[in-house]
Amino acid sequence: AMRAPALGAEVVGVRRSVRPGAPCPDYCLRVVPQSELDAELPQADLVALSLPGTPETLHMFDAARLARCKQGAILLNVGRGSTVDCLALADAVHSGHLFGAALDVTDPEPLPSDHPLWSEPNVIITPHISGRFSLAKTLDNIVEIFIHNLKLYAAGQPVDNQVSRTTHYVSGGSGGQRLVCGMP
């Protein structure tokens, strides 16, 4: 999303909630609350998903929501496979409503060999590698976060990047490092 404006794209961010007065990232035209998602879909040439797997996001992109997408749009999913109904996605691509899809995650995962998405020429499926955890820098960051959190834990302080068991999102912490994927 951060590089898309350099290619002439306008980026609209969608968040579960938007705090009044919260700054909009430089690369975004605007950030809207999730309640406005369906109004944005008919205008989007590319719908990029990086959602967590929560009860609220389960099949968030079902047949009805995929039908709201712009004719000829592309769906990209690098979050959790459970956010997209993959059979409905296969139908949307096969019918021509969506031009195609790029999926690093699927539901189920791995996708069965007889799943209809495999036979769609405009669908690219990668084996859950978009996070690039194999890069040395990424592994260094993971170790750095672990050591930082271990020190906090040993001191009896809340750790950073802790996922809430209630919301399934990252909750607060010590206020130190907040190395979290997604929009700030």
Feature-to-residue mapping (PLM):
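Rossmann-like dinucleotide-binding domain for NAD(H)/NADP(H)
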Residues: 72, 78-184
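Rossmann-like adenosine-cofactor binding region
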Residues: 17-116
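Conserved anion/nucleotide-ligand pocket segment
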Residues: 1-10
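Short, structured coil segments at secondary-structure junctions
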Residues: 7, 26-27, 119-121
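The conserved SAM/SAH-binding core of class I Rossmann-like methyltransferase domains
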Residues: 14
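A short, gly/pro- and small-residue-rich
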Residues: 11, 64-69, 142-146
